[in-house]
């Protein structure tokens, strides 16, 4: 890297709030509310991004809950609610949640900012407990 390129990175500052919250297994609404409350506190402290643990919205391990359509509907509604909350210009959210894409389920991280889902990244290397 040239000195000019290094200087460009030296001036970049991002404040990340780690959401070390205890999600309730299967209680999507409560987990969403916890995250929204934490986002308010993080915004007051100047955070740019909030990062949650893997599968935060569902709780971990979600096991067979992710096979229920009504549960996945609640997950999708919570992601939409969280995304809309980011329209206020406050911190972006990176939230871990299960994702239903047609008939396939993923363990994903959603990047929410500016009132929408900006990106989704699916976990590639899943644990093998067998």
Report the location of each language-model feature.
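Hydrophobic structural segments
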Residues: 1-130
